[in-house]
A protein has these predicted regions:
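Core segments of cupin and vicinal oxygen chelate
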Residues: 17-63, 67
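Vicinal oxygen chelate
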Residues: 2, 9, 19-26, 81, ...
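A broadly used, surface-exposed interaction patch
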Residues: 65-68, 79, 84
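Conserved N-terminal glycine/acidic-rich loop preference
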Residues: 5-8, 15, 55
């Protein structure tokens, strides 16, 4: 038993409170492909009414949802301490852009999309106003990405229009070429993202 050295555990799951469990589970099913492994009525005396455990990979649960009718969406959350966003990583830019297309067909549009030098990210808002980031690594491996993160320039993101990136990809550009062209400003959106309207 080690009692002297800090062991580095992995982040395993996040828990969210909600008054709207069914809508939340459906949203995360559509976006992340979650499967609910268990949904139980909380015992008497619990601060919650229902608890659901869900995952989209081999881990028993990545998200837990705690439903209680007494909670409400914080309309002033940008002034309060909180979890700012939760991120999920795709293996490739094609997977990320393909997800954007799939979600758009379902009427789900992002709040923001950007090339952040070390990664490309698209941000959505769930039914309770939580910000969910979908991203992919712009470099070959995690070690290279870490070095890029350490050397970030003052401007840490370049806004992009996923539609323009998809058109360039279909025209034959590689994922790396898309990154280079995004940084050069080629895929800038026609209109600015209204980030102030989101509950960041």
């Amino acid at each position: 038993m080690n009692t002297d050295i800090t062991v580095h555990p992995r982040l395993q799951h996040c828990g969210l409170t909600t008054a709207n469990l069914d809508a939340m589970l459906e949203w995360y099913r559509k976006v992340l492909g979650i499967i609910v492994h268990n949904r139980v009525t909380a015992p008497a005396g619990s601060p919650f009414e229902t608890v659901a455990f869900a995952t989209n990979d081999e881990v028993n649960h990545r998200l837990s949802f705690f439903e209680t009718s007494s909670v409400s969406i914080d309309q002033n959350k940008d002034h309060h301490a909180r979890v700012q966003h939760i991120a999920f990583e795709y293996e490739s830019l094609d997977d990320l852009l393909g997800t954007y297309v799939r979600l758009k067909k379902l009427g789900m549009v992002p709040l923001w999309a950007a090339d952040q030098f070390f990664q490309t990210a698209i941000y959505y808002e769930d039914p309770d106003g939580n910000i969910i980031e979908l991203n992919t690594n712009n470099f070959a491996n995690d070690w290279t990405v870490t070095e890029q993160l350490r050397a970030l320039p003052p401007q840490v993101h370049i806004n992009v229009d996923p539609e323009k990136m998809i058109a360039a990809r279909k025209a034959g550009a590689s994922a790396w070429q898309l990154h280079e062209r995004a940084v050069a400003g080629e895929f800038s959106p026609s209109a600015s993202y209204e980030l102030h309207t989101a509950r960041w």
